[in-house]
């Protein structure tokens, strides 16, 4: 019998990098510049409970938290009263330039605070070692609240179905620029923390761009990224109102898994991806019998599903039933003796439904006079971050007017039926209210998950220990919680009469009904531990079960190197696709005409005798002649994916398919006509050689279904004619197999630069290298352009063998196959640009129309939040040095 030594070594824990909008701490700077004060923040209780669980109680995971410090405030002492008062840190008045030593000191303070939190938890059954796991994102600049503008003033309203008046273009642009920098600062910080094999978990709408930024940063890594969206996700009709809608979706689909609070939110997201990104999706059921989607976009697959967040039920019950809470409960009951207590706690914003709640309560008192003097509504309204905004001020006035109206109509000198508290209340007071409540009333008009509802049910589940029964919950149908607490009394908050009837019914329930309701609701409450483990387990399964999990990212085009290579080259060849590359994709192909800016850039490129420019498009000869050849005769043109060519300054087209049998067109056209009749919005584009069936203007689901069916039918007979059936962007094209863009590229590169093309002559691969191009920029966006990129890569490989000693100073042959689209797109190109706008910026850079700074790709930030090596960064460093010198001088009494 063989025995093996038992492995007693500790199990290696999976590292998790948790990315949150803001660290769960409030940071203050005291009177001394080294006096840091750290305290816990309020709000996001469910998320912070998840962070606590991973940090203190999970033995499976090692957590690292990356988050913004939030607005750092300074404590100012009143000279007369000596009382400390908090004021926002404003760099205009008091520059806060932190030295590296100060940043390290504050980080250590945060770590110590986390450890002290752990020591306060005396009854944890599982103890995980506390690591130095807090990694602050530093964004110390003037007007610290600027980082919130785009998320709070543009994204948040749209996600909650609020269409704000259009912002001024320049203001929205500045907000967006800050939003991008905010996400890039996180990417930079994660780059310092990340190790191969880590799981990255990103939370909520401040960080929508981060998944794709991380994929670009860790290009060669099999990186696992999960994203959880805590807020609602709107229908496509609302989401598409966002001016940066595509960029936001592009950012998100860099994740491996995107998760929402409920199925309707995930369905809306998938719909937006289909309509705005031309994505496809397969629907199935997950282990919880909920809908999940495998979304295919840019050649990669993303899992999209829902998993409602929970609460820390164990901690809530522990905190809610203490002697201190017992005494507070007794005090509240004595204050409202013999009265039914309805409680509500909401943020005072336009979606929490405080106004709707007050109107419903007013209707209730009017409809049921027997309840007057018998019921009190205790409403706690927490101030929002933008408390001083005009909208919040108007809402506050409206709420106060309603409260005064109800109290004056139905109250008296001894009693007011509405007790409204516009403040943040301590946790012990909140838990006391949950315990004494006879009814919890939640009337939000839109939210992701209302944790007040979950906490109320949790507390009420244990009231039987006090010889009481759990009391009912009235919940808005527009709250994400209504999909979880299915046995709550669900109402439409806009129907005040229906809500009033529900209040009356809930208050009249007998003990048996309350007991049944309590047990049902308690079983429906998800715990934060289950939510955390399920989400992370799913990501781990994806990582271990999928051999093709690695999604290689195409790096952004290095434009500074491109510019230098362009300047050094003498024989430059430009190869451009048209639709989706030089112009955006539009519903009607006939509307995709060149812009004035494109004409200007092409004219400047053509004016340089060292340049040759070719447009290699799927468009027909007529279109290319009208919009390009007729206006810029210096352009070389290739139509119908290489079927026709027209040389520079030449009037005649050469048909490269002249000897090909075209009888196949009749049969293909008949099949396409059949599907055009069956698919409203589709149409056939009949070129001289190729036939293309377009379905961009159809209902996406129907168009995709019929496109798949059409392709299968065409493939059943096209092999007999040596034809290729290609999937384009919302189209199916049929053309001769031997003709493609790659053959045109091969002909143009293996050619003496600057000499006319002999279309009927074969390709010679024996030309001296110094007669061929030394700079080739090839741009395209779809499947057909991969033939160009593939051919360029093949030629480069050939040149490495034939001319190993003739590389340029950058170690290459000046070949730049560049795809236009997302970095996660499957391609053989060596680099990418995101969209036609970036294409024009890049070409503008080459002809001197655009500065290098304007055409910068991602923004690299320094520790103060400035663009690295920019003018503002240099000024910041100088100001920092001056400030440190001034401060040192004040300590020593010296003059600066």
UniProtKB/Swiss-Prot annotation:
GO biological process entries: cellular response to nitrogen starvation; positive regulation of autophagy; trehalose biosynthetic process; trehalose metabolic process
Name of the protein described by the UniProt record: Trehalose-phosphatase
Induction description: By heat shock. Repressed by glucose.
Stated role: Phosphatase catalytic subunit of the trehalose synthase complex that catalyzes the production of trehalose from glucose-6-phosphate and UDP-alpha-D-glucose in a two step process.
Family to which the UniProt record says this protein belongs: In the N-terminal section; belongs to the glycosyltransferase 20 family.
Enzyme kind, highest EC tier: hydrolase
Quaternary assembly: The trehalose synthase complex is composed of the two catalytic subunits TPS1 and TPS2, and at least one of the two regulatory subunits TPS3 or TSL1.
UniProt GO MF annotations: trehalose-phosphatase activity
EC number: 3.1.3.12
Pathways per UniProt: Carbohydrate biosynthesis
Additional note from the record: Present with 22700 molecules/cell in log phase SD medium.
Gene: TPS2
Entry-linked PANTHER family: TREHALOSE-6-PHOSPHATE SYNTHASE, TREHALOSE-PHOSPHATASE
Known catalytic reactions: alpha,alpha-trehalose 6-phosphate + H2O = alpha,alpha-trehalose + phosphate
GO cellular component terms, A-Z: alpha,alpha-trehalose-phosphate synthase complex (UDP-forming); mitochondrion
InterPro entries: Glyco_trans_20, HAD-like_sf, HAD-SF_hydro_IIB, HAD_sf, Trehalose_PPase
Annotated control of activity: Inhibited by EDTA.
Cofactor: Mg(2+)
UniProt region (Glycosyltransferase), positions on chain: 1-554
Keyword presence, Hydrolase: yes
Keyword terms of this UniProt record: Cytoplasm, Hydrolase, Stress response
Effect of pH on activity: Optimum pH is 6.0.
Subcellular location: Cytoplasm
């Amino acid at each position: 019998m063989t025995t093996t030594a038992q492995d007693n070594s500790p199990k290696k824990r999976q590292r998790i990098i948790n990315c949150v909008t803001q660290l769960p701490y409030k940071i203050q700077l005291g009177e001394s510049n080294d006096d840091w004060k750290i305290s816990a923040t309020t709000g996001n209780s469910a998320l912070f409970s998840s962070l606590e669980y991973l940090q203190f109680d999970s033995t499976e995971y090692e957590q690292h938290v990356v988050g913004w410090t939030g607005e750092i405030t300074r404590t100012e002492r009143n000279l007369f009263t000596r009382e400390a008062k908090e004021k926002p840190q404003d760099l205009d008045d008091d520059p806060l330039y932190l030295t590296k030593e100060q940043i390290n000191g504050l980080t250590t303070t945060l770590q110590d605070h986390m450890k002290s939190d752990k020591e306060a938890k005396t009854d944890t059954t599982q103890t995980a070692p506390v690591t130095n796991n807090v990694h602050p994102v530093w964004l110390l600049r003037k007007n610290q609240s600027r980082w919130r503008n785009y998320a709070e003033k543009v994204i948040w309203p749209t996600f909650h179905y609020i269409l704000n008046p259009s912002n001024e273009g320049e203001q929205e642009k500045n907000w967006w620029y800050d939003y991008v920098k905010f996400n890039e600062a996180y990417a930079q910080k994660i780059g310092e923390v990340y190790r191969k094999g880590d799981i990255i978990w990103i939370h909520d709408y401040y960080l929508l761009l981060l998944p794709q930024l991380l994929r670009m940063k860790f290009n060669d890594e099999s990186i696992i990224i999960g994203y959880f969206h805590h807020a609602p996700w709107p229908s496509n009709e609302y989401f598409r109102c966002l001016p940066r809608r595509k960029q936001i979706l592009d950012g998100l689909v860099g994740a491996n898994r995107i998760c929402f609070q409920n199925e309707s939110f995930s369905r809306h997201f998938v719909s937006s991806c289909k309509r705005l990104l031309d994505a496809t999706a397969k629907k199935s059921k997950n282990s919880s019998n909920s809908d999940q989607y495998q979304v295919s976009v840019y050649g990669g697959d993303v899992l999209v599903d829902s998993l409602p967040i929970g609460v820390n039920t164990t901690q809530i019950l522990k905190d809610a039933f203490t002697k201190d809470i017992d005494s507070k409960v007794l005090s509240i009951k004595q204050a409202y003796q013999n009265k039914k207590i309805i409680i509500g706690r909401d943020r005072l914003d336009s979606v929490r439904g405080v106004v709707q709640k007050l109107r419903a309560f007013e209707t209730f008192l009017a409809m049921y006079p027997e309840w007057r003097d018998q019921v009190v509504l205790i409403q706690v309204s927490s101030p929002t971050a933008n408390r001083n905004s005009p909208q919040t001020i108007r809402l506050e006035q409206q709420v106060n007017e309603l409260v005064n109206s109800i109290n004056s109509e139905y109250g008296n000198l001894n009693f007011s039926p509405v007790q409204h508290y516009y403040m943040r209340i301590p946790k012990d007071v909140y838990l006391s209210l949950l315990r004494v409540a006879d009814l919890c009333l939640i009337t939000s008009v839109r939210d992701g998950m209302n944790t007040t509802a979950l906490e109320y049910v949790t507390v009420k589940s244990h009231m039987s220990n006090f010889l009481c029964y759990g009391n009912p919950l009235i919940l808005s149908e527009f709250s994400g919680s209504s999909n979880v607490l299915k046995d709550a009394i669900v109402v439409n908050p806009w129907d005040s009469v229906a809500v009033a009837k529900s209040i009356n019914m809930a208050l009249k329930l007998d003990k048996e009904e309350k007991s049944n309701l309590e047990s049902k609701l308690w079983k429906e409450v998800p715990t934060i531990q289950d939510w955390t483990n399920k989400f992370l387990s799913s990501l781990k399964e994806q990582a271990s079960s999928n051999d093709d999990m690695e999604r290689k990212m195409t790096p952004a085009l290095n434009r500074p190197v491109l510019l230098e290579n362009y300047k050094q080259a003498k024989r430059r060849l430009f190869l451009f696709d048209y639709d989706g590359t030089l112009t955006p994709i539009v519903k009607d192909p006939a509307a995709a005409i060149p812009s004035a800016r494109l004409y200007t850039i092409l004219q400047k490129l053509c004016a340089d005798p060292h340049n040759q420019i070719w447009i290699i498009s799927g468009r027909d000869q007529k279109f290319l002649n009208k919009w390009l050849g007729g206006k810029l005769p210096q352009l070389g043109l290739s139509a119908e994916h290489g079927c026709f060519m027209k040389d520079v300054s030449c009037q005649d087209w050469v048909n490269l398919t002249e000897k090909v049998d075209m009888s196949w067109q009749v049969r293909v056209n008949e099949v396409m006509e059949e599907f055009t009749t069956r698919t409203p919005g589709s149409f056939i584009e009949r070129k001289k050689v190729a036939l293309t069936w377009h379905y961009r203007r159809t209902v996406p689901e129907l168009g995709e279904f019929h496109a798949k069916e059409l392709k299968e039918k065409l493939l059943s007979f096209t092999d007999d004619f040596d034809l290729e059936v290609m999937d384009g962007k919302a189209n199916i094209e049929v053309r001769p197999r031997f003709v493609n863009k790659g053959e045109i590229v091969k002909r143009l590169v293996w050619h003496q630069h600057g000499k006319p093309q002999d279309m009927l002559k074969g390709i010679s691969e024996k030309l001296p290298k110094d007669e061929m191009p030394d700079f080739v920029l090839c741009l395209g966006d779809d499947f057909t352009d991969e033939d160009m990129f593939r051919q360029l890569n093949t030629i480069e490989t050939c040149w490495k063998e034939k001319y190993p000693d003739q590389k340029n100073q950058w170690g290459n042959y000046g070949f730049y196959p560049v795809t236009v689209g997302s970095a996660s797109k499957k391609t053989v190109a060596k680099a990418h640009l995101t969209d036609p706008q970036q294409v024009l910026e890049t070409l503008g850079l080459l002809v001197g129309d655009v500065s290098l700074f304007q055409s910068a790709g991602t923004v690299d930030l320094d520790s103060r939040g400035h663009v690295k090596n920019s003018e503002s960064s240099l000024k910041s460093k100088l100001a920092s040095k001056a400030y440190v010198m001034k401060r040192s001088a004040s300590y020593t009494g010296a003059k600066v």
